[in-house]
Every structure is written in structure tokens, then in C-alpha cells.
Amino acid sequence: MLVACDVYRPAAIDQLEVLAQQENFPCHLNRETKDVPQIAREGWEESKKNGADLVIFDTAGRLQIDDDLVSELELLKREVNPHEILLVADAALGQEAVNVAKTFHERLNLTGIILTKVDGDARGGACLLYTSDAADD
């Protein structure tokens, strides 16, 4: 099940809804509130009621450290107590992606990173920094 928790990007909820419909995947949407922890809680309850094996909480992208948005993720984490916390990062961000990953790991205890666009340009080397920094922890 997908849970639409990106309440900031215009049309993010609509985009996730279309994707879920195309793939015949259940999706929890709430266009009536911008309270991300509430939406997450509702989606979590719906997933349990429907016996979902997997729940993905699609949250707003964060290109740099934004304390309010990271705090929002901490609240979401407390609401649903996830088994996995994955950061999806654009390798083109280079060193900034490493800084984001470090902060997210410190605050959320990441269990993994999905790095996109690693073949797009030279900044794809950020993945080596992720690996190196993770090995140091």
C-alpha cells in the first residue's frame, strides 16, 4: 500500500494516485489535511485493516537539511514505527546528498539508501562517499 504524505509539492498526491491506479496498487490519500503524521496514522490503520504486507509512505523531497521537515519525519516514525527507513537521494546532489544522508541517519536511524541517477554525471561518486561514511559508523 502507498500512503501519500507529500503535502507540499503541487500535484504530488495526484501523481501518486495515478501511479497506484496504473499498477493496481492500493493507495491512501487525504486531501483534507496537511498533517503528515495524521495521514500516516490513517494510512497505517487502513493497511492493517486491509492486510497489506508492505506500506510505503511517500513523503516530500528534501534537497537540503530542513529542520521542520526532518522533525515531521520523526513524528511520522513515532506514529508508525517502521521496520525500514530508506532515503531516496539524487546522486547529482554530490556532497550535499552525503550531508543529507548523515543528518537523516542521525535523526531517523536509516536502514538504507536508494541512490538515483548515479550514471547522470560525475557527482554520482557520492555513492562512494555514502559507502565510506557508512562503513565508519
Task: Describe each model-derived feature in a short phrase.
Residues 1-84, 98, 109-110, 125:
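Nucleotide-state-sensitive switch-loop elements of NTP-binding domains
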Residues 3-5, 60, 89-92, 114-121:
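G-domain G4 guanine-recognition motif of GTPases
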Residues 93-100, 127:
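Glycine-rich, charge-decorated loop segments at or immediately adjacent to ligand/cofactor-binding or catalytic sites
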Residues 101-102, 116:
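Amphipathic helical hotspot of TIR/SEFIR-family domains
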Residues 10, 94, 120-121, 137:
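General alpha-helical segment detector with a strong preference for membrane-spanning helices
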Residues 130-135:
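Conserved small/polar residues in nucleotide/adenosyl-binding loops
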